[in-house]
């Protein structure tokens, strides 16, 4: 099986807390160093651990904690042409009830990666942190760093207080469009901080239950973004759903199209099928890819939406349920493989093809 190039849309580095603290003004610095850094996570027990136990160097250092280690032990090993760095510690701060502290952390984390990580390797690209608990402050941060070299995206948590189609978030989308940046959401903070319960039914009892149900927040945000007219007001906006799976999309759009035909008076700004809007503006990453007992079922799902334009490979490194490039590529037919593994991401993030020696 030949993979001509690999662009990874979801990699999770972890910055040194001391380097973040250096960029925080008081009183935030002292508070950050004391360990109070935002709502965190629900901490359901995962018997595998969240981070892969084998993602360590020969000296026992975590690979995701160093730009040099990440380049050597992941990018070099899998021959990654580009990787989008989505720092995992920026998600929880977006659900803090204290927007000023959250905005300060976002700025500090962004500066660590822009000043220390991106210069370390030309293959690194970065999703800037934007804490949506105060959209105006988030928009200010996007305008501050959105034009910096290596910045390709704005990242927000999929856990949220209200759906992202509501007009309170328009300042974020306006700032992103000004800089030509897609906006992405990522799971993991559903149910923490100022977000609502992680499922429509309330709080689950186990990691298995919580993790399986994370797709619910993606569905809710997508319906909201489309029906509340975000892509009508911001026709240049692109939106990326990271780590939400794939196969739920076609049946959701069938239902949404059907309901729109009967209820279009409730969304008078929509003048075409919701599915057409989604196909034009929305992208999904592959991990965690569905694995049915009969692989042909997955391939049939790929025929039900424009996967060649919407799907981008993601490893989710170094998390426990990550997918390697070779594993992912095997799941896609030859005619689709290059689009998923690199071409769609290259076009979305405007990444020049690197010379290969």
Question: What is each residue range found by the language model?
Answer:
Residues 79-221, 228, 355:
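Active-site gating/metal-coordination segments in enzymes
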Residues 2-7, 18-82, 111-115, 119, ...:
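Mid-to-C-terminal alpha-helical segments outside catalytic/metal-binding sites
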Residues 12, 160, 188-189, 226, ...:
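Catalytic metal-binding/acid-base residues of hydrolase active sites
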Residues 213-221, 265-296:
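Aromatic-anchored helix/helix-loop segment that forms the rim or "lid"
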Residues 149-152, 177-182, 234-237, 279-283, ...:
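Glycine-enriched alpha-helix->loop->beta-strand junction motifs that scaffold or abut catalytic
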Residues 183, 187-191, 226-281:
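Aromatic-lined glycan-binding groove of carbohydrate-active enzymes
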Residues 7-9, 83-85, 126-128, 154-156, ...:
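Hydrophobic faces of well-ordered beta-strands that scaffold small-molecule active sites
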Residues 14-15, 91-93, 163, 192-193, ...:
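Flexible loop/turn segments at secondary-structure boundaries
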């Amino acid at each position: 099986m030949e993979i001509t190039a690999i662009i990874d849309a979801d990699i999770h580095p972890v910055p040194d807390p001391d380097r973040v603290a250096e960029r925080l003004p008081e009183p935030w610095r002292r508070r950050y160093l004391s360990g109070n850094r935002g709502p965190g996570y629900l901490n359901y027990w995962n018997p595998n651990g969240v981070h892969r136990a084998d993602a360590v160097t020969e000296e026992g250092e975590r690979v995701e904690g160093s730009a040099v280690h990440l380049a050597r032990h992941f990018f070099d090993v899998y021959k990654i042409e580009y990787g989008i760095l989505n720092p995992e510690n920026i998600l929880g701060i977006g659900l803090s009830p204290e927007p000023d502290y959250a905005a300060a952390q976002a700025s500090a984390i962004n500066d660590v990666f822009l000043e220390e990580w991106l210069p370390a390797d030309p293959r690194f690209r970065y999703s800037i942190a934007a804490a949506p608990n105060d959209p105006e402050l988030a928009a200010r941060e996007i305008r501050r760093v959105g034009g910096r070299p290596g910045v390709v995206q704005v990242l927000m948590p999929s856990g949220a207080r209200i759906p992202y189609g509501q007009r309170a978030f328009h300042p974020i989308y306006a700032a992103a469009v000004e800089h030509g940046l897609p906006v992405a959401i990522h799971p993991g903070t559903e149910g923490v901080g100022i977000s609502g319960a992680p499922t429509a039914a309330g709080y689950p009892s186990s990691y298995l239950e919580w993790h399986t149900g994370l797709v619910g927040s993606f569905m809710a945000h997508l319906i909201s973004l489309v029906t509340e007219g975000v892509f009508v007001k911001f026709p240049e906006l692109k939106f990326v759903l990271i780590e939400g799976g794939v196969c739920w999309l076609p049946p959701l759009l069938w239902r949404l199209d059907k309901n729109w035909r009967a209820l279009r008076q409730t969304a008078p700004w929509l003048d075409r099928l919701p599915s057409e809007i989604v196909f034009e503006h929305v992208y999904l990453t592959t991990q965690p890819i569905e694995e049915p007992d009969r692989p042909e079922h997955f391939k049939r799902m790929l025929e039900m939406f424009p996967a060649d334009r919407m799907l981008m490979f993601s490893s989710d490194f170094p998390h426990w349920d990550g997918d390697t490039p070779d594993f992912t590529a095997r799941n896609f037919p030859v005619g689709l493989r290059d689009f998923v593994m690199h071409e769609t991401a290259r076009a979305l993030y405007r990444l020049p093809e690197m010379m290969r020696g």
